[in-house]
């Protein structure tokens, strides 16, 4: 029993792998990328359940082309049916002596020819309508071209009509470009002159202001250079008063920053506090 079960298991696994490989077999049109992403068993399972759809030979092409085949079929079907009914309705009893049957067949043929003639008339009418529409469209196009000023008649009269028109257009374009360049040059010249005048005015104004401010500052420095608030001049007053003044804020703290330059504000010596 155990050996039989083992054999059955082995057969089942082998059959499963074989079926799996058969389902995943590669076709001629498939690539490796599609083989990874596709699930092939769907096609084999549903191939017979859902047969492929067939396109019927319907009236799609005839409707798009507009050749009137439907009208011919609609118009010709009743006539053929009537002739067939008439032909079937004839019997030996109805046919008289002397070739009445032949006359009946001729009547049927005449009816068929009449229906074909009617269909031919319809085709000719449709062709005439199409030709009229094309002529109207051509007339409209010619009118549009004449309105735009480039009619075919004017160009056809001269041997090189198109070339002359193109040359005239190029000349007009060149003239317009030259005019635009001249206008740009004039505008640049005017802007340059205006900017130079403004620069000269601003420089003169700056010089006048500098002269006025320097005179006032010198007067202020001369007044305040020898004083240190309410104390007045001391023994250790500045000996270089003849030099150009540099401002009261600098002269008041020159000795402090010169003597204690290498120390921080928290490392002032006793001399600083004693002199204060």
From Swiss-Prot:
Official protein name in the record: Integrin-binding sialoprotein
UniProt feature, compositional bias: Low complexity: 189-200
Compositional bias annotation for Polar residues: 145-165
Gene Ontology CC terms, in alphabetical order: extracellular region
UniProt source species: Gallus gallus
Further details from the record: It is possible that the segments of clustered carboxyl groups mediate the strong binding to hydroxyapatite.
Basic and acidic residues bias spans: 106-119
Protein task: Binds tightly to hydroxyapatite. Appears to form an integral part of the mineralized matrix. Probably important to cell-matrix interaction. Promotes adhesion and migration of various cells via the alpha-V/beta-3 integrin receptor (ITGAV:ITGB3).
Glycosylation sites per record: 148, 153, 162
Keywords, comma-separated and alphabetical: Biomineralization, Cell adhesion, Glycoprotein, Phosphoprotein, Secreted, Sialic acid, Signal, Sulfation
Entry comment, domain topic: The Arg-Gly-Asp (RGD) sequence serves as an integrin-binding motif and is required for integrin-mediated cell attachment.
PANTHER family for this protein: BONE SIALOPROTEIN 2
Subunit-level organization: Monomer. Interacts with integrins; the interaction promotes cell adhesion.
One Pfam family of this chain: BSP_II
Annotated stretches, region: Disordered: 54-251
Modified residues (Sulfotyrosine): 272-273
Signal sequence interval, chain numbering: 1-16
Subcellular location: Secreted
Post-translational modification remark: Phosphorylated on serine and threonine residues.
Sequence motif: Cell attachment site, positions: 116-118, 228-230
Acidic residues: bias regions: 61-75, 120-144, 167-188
Motif (Integrin-binding motif): 246-248
